[in-house]
Amino acid sequence: IGRLYIFFGLFGGMLALILNILVRFERASIGSVGILDFGSSNQFFQTWSLSRTSLLFFCVLPLLIGLATYLVPLQVGAPSLSFPRAAALAFWAWLIGILIHVVTVFADGGLGEPNPTSQFAQGMDPEATELSILSIGMVVLALLVGTVCVIATIISQRPQGMTLFELPLFSWSMLVAGSIWILALPIWLSNLAISWVDFLGADALRYGAVENIWGQLSWLWSQPMIFAFAIPVLGIAGDIIPVSSGVSQRQYRIQQIAIGAMGALSFGAFAQPFFNPDVADQAVFVSMGILVLVPILVFMGGLADTSIRGNLSFSAHLVLSVVGMLALLVAAAASAFHVSGPAIGAIQEINDSWLDGLITWLRDVHGTVMATAVMEHVLIASVIGVVAGLYYWSPKIFGYQLNRNVGALSAITLLGGLVLSGGSNIINGILDEGDEVFNSSAYEGVWDTDAVEFFNIIGAIGGVLLLAGIGLVVLDLTISVILRKGNSENANDPWGGHTLEWSTDSPPPSGNFSAAPVVDNERPLLFPAVTGGDDQ
């Protein structure tokens, strides 16, 4: 099941990036027929919203859950995943839900229309729209079941001596992230259910009106909630970098606390602008948007402190994990900038005139593609992190190592694509390009339309590079694993790993371990004797 999630998740990411490229090309021509003529704002919005739902629900979450489904039982010394039949059912429900949702969107359904002249004046089909709502709910419910299976494994199947403080950082990050998902996604499903119930009425009054459906759902892609889907990036890097350095992770508890703090700062179910229009000015929202940068910096500092005390060996997974961390750091910095207007407004009480221009400019950033830039950096960082995990754990998952040179090339390609695609959105956000746009009236506040058009072309080129980066990974998996051209020597532990998954065969036998492991520290293969789990 884990392998299937990974396989289809990569293709889901390619679908999302293709749709994003189409949107960026459309935005490259403001106020006239674009390079790609969508024909109506409804068709544009269908493509725009599907690019977001597919990147999160068809790519990032299944990749993370797939990696965890396979690895978490091995990392915690469990004989199998908890509720394996439920996990299998969840995967097939997820896949069927995706197929239904994509078909309904292309059949003039989708998750609403922001500016309709009437309920279905732009050609939306009510039955297809209803099925779009139900199918995406089915997808998210399936992902929740998969998450529950992973968390149940961590909680109930740890071996003797392994407390939560001895969990490998990837398993710990999945426990933290999964807990946030379980708290937040049911609220999102409730928003979806309210929209669906009202939509079924003869005359949708508010929640089911097509112009309001997306507004009730969009908080999942916004700060702070979006960071909950990148928490495992920290865990993956935390497992890879100490092994690549050949030393144990220093200040292990602080690393765990940093991951936990990021989880606490990424719970965003309260930040729903549809129900709370003033949320962007509230102290909690602003504080979370700024403070999320702190645990990321602390975690990266811990990894840097560990790596300089060892001897880093070059590998594709090392490069990819560093790129993923840097992308997440940029996302957190952009988020802090995005929400800083109200924070500076509080300082204005000291002097009520000299900060006026700055505050007005920072407030203007709200509602622009700056929010899209944050989302894109976070989700692509998650994709890069999972790819790093694939190159690190591929001997354990598939029995073959992936090609190191192809992995390094994919890291460079993904980094270049993110710089062009995400960076152009940051610049266009500063230039006041609005989000969720189609017609020229939405660009009335843009400083320089020619510059916005130019950077949208740059963003489309970046999208092509991102697509090529994922394509390289798929190609490497095909050649190394499916065609069995990869190196299978020393597949049990080619890197000198520190955690339990490297103590069994690759791929693991039925039951995972020949005997139940006994653990007394967080690095059981590095310190197999009872030497304590204290920080060094």
Feature locations, PLM:
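Membrane-embedded and interfacial regions of multi-pass energy-transducing membrane proteins
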Residues: I1-Q536
